Amino acid sequence: MTRLSWTEDAVGVGKVCERGFTVARDGNMVPGVLWYPTAASAPRPLVLMGHGGGGHKRNERIVMLGRLFAGDYGWYAAAIDGPVHGGRGPVTDASDPAYRQMWQRPEIVQEMIDDWRATLDALSTLRDVDSARVGYYGVSMGTMFGLPYVASDQRVRAAVLGKAGMTGSSVQRSGIDTHFKTFASKVTVPVLFMMQWDDERFERDGQLVLFDRLGTQDKRLHAYPGQHADNAPEAFEVAAAFLKRYLERGEA
């Protein structure tokens, strides 16, 4: 059984409200943040957002995306802390020993799948969340956990993934290639896969192999110059436009 509890009062800035929450799952508390439009008057799509390694539910990029999705597109957007990140542990950088130790737990990916499932269960009880129109955004660690989740939850209609692959230093540290081999072919929803051409953590060829392994036929690959932490200025708007194509299809 899952239960949503608000941990903060809603704070409104312009067209967007932000509010912290926790989801209870099997005795564990999953901390998260919800962004939503102040003027929502009908059920709206929901985008689940996974942060990168060393990040947390309120890091700069996640907050920017939450405000973009809620303020410019009128959607709900939610982020939760990954294991041992943010309110769940000490990791503030992917080089922390605790980050490597996290990946040594064979059950860690399934636990995060269950956390996301429980979070969606809980948020779906909100009046203005349209649980039939759910998207996912997550690159780097957001894909390492998010790809298996998207493959496992048929409620997700489209996903933005990337900055991850089958080879590279991050793969050697985490062993995530084993999970990608299990789950990539089970991803059947539309996917936008974004990669950095000179990524120093996930090798270029390994990212292309992961893209090829995705089971969906509705997929596209966007490559940008730069290293792992770089972002093209248009990349986030491209991601939002991709999600809009599937989450708002059929709207008047």
Locations of the language-model features?
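C-terminal catalytic histidine-bearing segment of alpha/beta-hydrolase fold enzymes
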Residues: T216-A252
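Short beta-strand element of the alpha/beta-hydrolase
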Residues: A42-G52
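A fold-wide structural signal in alpha/beta-hydrolase
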Residues: L46, G71-P83
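The feature captures the conserved acid-bearing segment of alpha/beta-hydrolase catalytic domains
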Residues: S169-A223
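N-terminal cap/lid segment of alpha/beta-hydrolase-fold proteins
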Residues: M1-A42
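The serine-hydrolase catalytic nucleophile loop
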Residues: G54-R67, A78, G82
